[in-house]
From Swiss-Prot:
Residues 1-52, 196-234 are annotated as: Disordered. It holds the Pfam family HLH. GO terms for cellular component: chromatin; cytoplasm; nucleoplasm; nucleus. Residues 49-104 form the bHLH domain. Keywords: Developmental protein, DNA-binding, Notch signaling pathway, Nucleus, Repressor, Transcription, Transcription regulation. Belongs to the HEY family. This is Hairy/enhancer-of-split related with YRPW motif protein 1.
Length: 304
């Protein structure tokens, strides 16, 4: 009686593939010697190459995830504001991103491509960071405690300014782009009265702007004690910069830097301009002021 030979079905081949997978997984777990002992050198090199490629792909995937999370942490305002105080987890960054996108969607969808609104948001965050740095400077460097009246008045003034700017930016959010000059009281296409070019012979080459009397009245009311800041009534501005009397004394780099200040967004009413006597080397008070630190905010704090 003949003995029947066993027939190998498809289940047997699947069992062989399972054994090969188990050998490969055992190789990944560290049992390299036992797994490679029954394999040819070609098979073992293929397994090692496949394992190496898998590690490289996994590392690149993790790097892409980490880079994307870093970009989200920088782009989302709430995450950007919080990143200096504590380390953010990946779940927190993703949650803040979802909340920010929901807020933009609730606002009507205009915030996705509104670069001005995004810039105003970052400007508010930057101002808050600078305010915190000022408070740290006053406490650490200047040695002023929290109850010092100078520190209290300065910090409260900056807080009020930040709140007013945030409220103003929120009120004008639906009016489109607001130029920097209109925010601070003058138009960006008109140079500031203190920085307009002057003519040494007293005749102006261009006609006076209709907004010049308005600026002159503002300058006169802001600085009644400084006659050099008042423009002459003849229509030409004359010498409005008391620091230098002619443009020939300025070097070309300084002239270019002064010309670039016409687009500076902040008002010049909060800064005192120096007189020529203060810049002369023979001033009697120069030697007495050498040992004192320069603190312009200490003299201006009374106006807050």
């Amino acid at each position: 009686m003949k003995r029947a030979h066993p027939e190998y079905s498809s289940s047997d081949s699947e069992l062989d593939e399972t054994i090969e997978v188990e050998k490969e997984s055992a190789d990944e777990n560290g049992n390299l010697s036992s797994a490679l002992g029954s394999m040819s050198p070609t098979t073992s090199s293929q397994i090692l190459a496949r394992k190496r490629r898998r590690g490289i792909i996994e590392k690149r995937r993790r790097d892409r995830i980490n880079n994307s999370l870093s970009e989200l942490r920088r782009l989302v305002p709430s995450a950007f504001e919080k990143q200096g105080s504590a380390k953010l987890e990946k779940a927190e960054i993703l949650q803040m991103t979802v909340d920010h996108l929901k807020m933009l969607h609730t606002a009507g969808g205009k915030g996705y491509f509104d670069a001005h609104a995004l810039a105003m948001d970052y400007r508010s965050l930057g101002f808050r960071e600078c305010l915190a740095e000022v408070a740290r400077y006053l406490s650490i460097i200047e040695g002023l405690d929290a109850s010092d009246p100078l520190r209290v008045r300065l910090v409260s003034h900056l807080n009020n300014y930040a709140s007013q700017r945030e409220a103003a930016s929120g009120a004008h959010a639906g009016l489109g782009h607001i130029p920097w000059g209109t925010v601070f009281g003058h138009h960006p296409h008109i140079a500031h009265p203190l920085l307009l070019p002057q003519n040494g012979h007293g005749n102006a080459g261009t006609t006076a702007s209709p907004t010049e009397p308005h600026h002159q009245g503002r300058l006169g009311s802001a600085h009644p004690e400084a006659p050099a800041l008042r423009a002459p009534p003849s229509g030409s501005l004359g010498p409005v910069l008391p620091v230098v009397t002619s443009a020939s004394k300025l070097s070309p780099p300084l002239l270019s830097s002064v010309a670039s200040l016409s687009a500076f967004p902040f008002s010049f009413g909060s800064f005192h301009l120096l007189s020529p006597n203060a810049l002369s080397p023979s001033a009697p008070t120069q030697a007495a002021n050498l040992g004192k630190p320069y603190r312009p905010w200490g003299t201006e704090i009374g106006a807050f």
